[in-house]
Amino acid sequence: MKRLNKLVLGINLLFLVISITAGCGMGKEAEIKKSFEKTLSMYPIKNLEDLYDKEGYRDDQFDKNDKGTWIVRSSMSIQPNGKDMNVKGMVLYMNRNSRTTNGYYYVDVIERQDKGIHRDNEKKYPVKMVDNKIIPTKDIKDENIKKEIENFKFFAQYGSFKDLSKYKEGDISYNPEVPSYSAKYQLTNDDYNVKQLRKRYDIPTNKAPKLLLKGTGNLKGSSVGYKDIEFTFVEKKGENIYFSDSLHLEPSEDK
């Protein structure tokens, strides 16, 4: 009888541990979603100049008279199996104090070398934004690059995350020492954002991507660290296809 009671007690304790662990996991997932939701709920921002009037997270890193600078990034990285990786993207710095924007479009070929050594061949093309139009600030002879800049749209302009709660059963990771955190979800090709990416990029795979929300810093908010979203279509040795995006507010250099 005593053995039976001990067995029942052991089983109950096991279920309790599992329940607590699952509860903590779900709680942390909700925290991660809430942390990203503050920014992603603004998507889509069709007119990027609207960001001049949008507030972001502020802490003691900001001077009291500094409205901050929004940093907008989007890039697509494609490495066919066994070949070099091609990366194309853009970064904009939108100063809310001066209401001016500058940045650059970049093209990078990361070559695979013997012994696993990589060599970058990044080229940057400075740009500015006027009346929601991105304009090169220097003469560009390559007509293809000029057209790519002219037609470029940030994911923040067409992506939509109105309801993050629809993403469920994610793979959650949290390291309080860094701190760092991430939530990964398997998507389908019917997902709205996946359709938008395929519409704009020649993605050489039919595989549906995983959505990765990853960041560092205080989950409740911090101007130190980062918050990125990534759509990972392929991730393995010698072959990678992924799209990266971020939008965050930082202290302005001009203050």
UniProtKB/Swiss-Prot annotation:
Q: Where is the lipid attached (N-palmitoyl cysteine)?
A: C24
The answer to keyword Ribosomal protein applying to this record is no
Please give the InterPro entries that the UniProt record associates with this protein. Csa, Csa_sf
Annotated signal peptide:
1-23
Which sites carry lipid of kind S-diacylglycerol cysteine?
Answer: C24
Which pairs are disulfide-linked?
Answer: none
User: Where is the protein localized?
Assistant: Cell membrane
Q: Which UniProt keywords apply?
A: Cell membrane, Lipoprotein, Membrane, Palmitate, Signal
Family annotation (Gene3D superfamilies): 2.50.20.40
Per UniProt, what is the membrane topology? Lipid-anchor
A single GO CC term for this protein reads: plasma membrane
- Domain of life, per UniProt, equals Bacteria
NCBIfam families associated with the record:
SA_tandem_lipo
Say which family it is in.
Belongs to the staphylococcal tandem lipoprotein family.
- Name-wise, this protein is Uncharacterized lipoprotein SAR0106
